[in-house]
Amino acid sequence: MYQLGDVKKIVLPGDPVEVQGKIRNGIYRGPDNKYYSEYFGTLQVSDQYVDVVPFSGQYIPRKGDKVIGKIIEVGPSTWTVDINSPYFAMLHMNDTPWRISSGDLKRYLNSGDYVYAKIMSVNEIKESWLTLKEPGLKKLEGGHMVLIHASRVPRVIGKGGGMVNMVKELTSTRIIIGQNGLIWIDGPIEGVTMAIAAIEMIEREAHTEGLTVRVESFLKELRGDKDGNQQDKANQ
């Protein structure tokens, strides 16, 4: 059972990694056909994938931050939440908008569910507690998740929210950005696909100037290509 203060398994470059699902990031196969870690970071294991996330790409929790987290364990009165940090966060049933009886937590949030929550406290060793008891905080239903480097979040949001609002408008999607680098996107599949491509572009080119204009042109070109193809079919 995970408890407050538990740390994910830390691996070093070259450490052997047991792989039972698909490998995604930070793992390579050696000449002996065994798998090894590529980074100094934490081992992330799910039912389908195994990753090693480098410490340089992980989020350090701060009081007041709004984050997206994944429920990974349900206890009698608390949920354990993965917030893309070396430490797991905790959510107590009293810090939700629901009236919950102890032991009945799975009716509201189960393993694999995502929440948009606020960090209400962090201690000196970065153990954190979450809350859902503020407007806008909630369980996230449906949608698609994208993970970016937490340091790129301000660039995705843009000055005064300009960048993300432009992406939402041009893709007809709803987007919620966690300050820990997790982003939730919902809407028509075409729009979601375009929004993901735009966010990946922003992360990749975050250090460059004139990015807002390029992202806008990129999305308009994608929309124009789609509209153009539909027009061609209509004229046939």
Curated annotation (Swiss-Prot):
Residues 64-133 form the S1 motif domain. GO terms for molecular function: poly(A) binding. It comes from the Archaea. The keyword RNA-binding applies. Keywords: Cytoplasm, Exosome, RNA-binding. Gene3D superfamilies: 2.40.50.100, K Homology domain, type 1 (3.30.1370.10), Nucleic acid-binding proteins (2.40.50.140). Its main location: cytoplasm. CDD domains: KH-I_Rrp4_prokar, S1_Rrp4. Residues 141-199 form the KH domain. GO terms for biological process: CUT catabolic process; exonucleolytic trimming to generate mature 3'-end of 5.8S rRNA from tricistronic rRNA transcript (SSU-rRNA, 5.8S rRNA, LSU-rRNA); poly(A)-dependent snoRNA 3'-end processing; RNA catabolic process; U4 snRNA 3'-end processing. Component of the archaeal exosome complex. Forms a trimer of Rrp4 and/or Csl4 subunits. The trimer associates with a hexameric ring-like arrangement composed of 3 Rrp41-Rrp42 heterodimers. Belongs to the RRP4 family. Non-catalytic component of the exosome, which is a complex involved in RNA degradation. Increases the RNA binding and the efficiency of RNA degradation. Confers strong poly(A) specificity to the exosome. This is Exosome complex component Rrp4. It comes from Thermoplasma volcanium (strain ATCC 51530 / DSM 4299 / JCM 9571 / NBRC 15438 / GSS1).
